Amino acid sequence: MVETRVRAKDIVKKTVISEETGRRFGVVGNVDFITESGELLNIIVIEPTVHLKDLNLKADEKGRYLIPFSAVKSIGDYVIVSENELV
């Protein structure tokens, strides 16, 4: 498996879309990561849509929704996530 490095600045402000349904979930506001290793843990979503709110995901201390980075399938013009891995 090829490991690809992703920088937080490359995904901030990109729209988050469901791989399965094409539904828009919101916009990447920031990422949560481990400082020592640089491992990305979660995408922090701002401007959440009703579709994202319906998934009852974990939220941070500011009430922003967290999408585990393990659910991210691809990053390009959009951040594509597997909705099946969120429920």
Which ranges hold each PLM region?
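Peripheral interaction segments used for macromolecular assembly
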Residues: 1-87
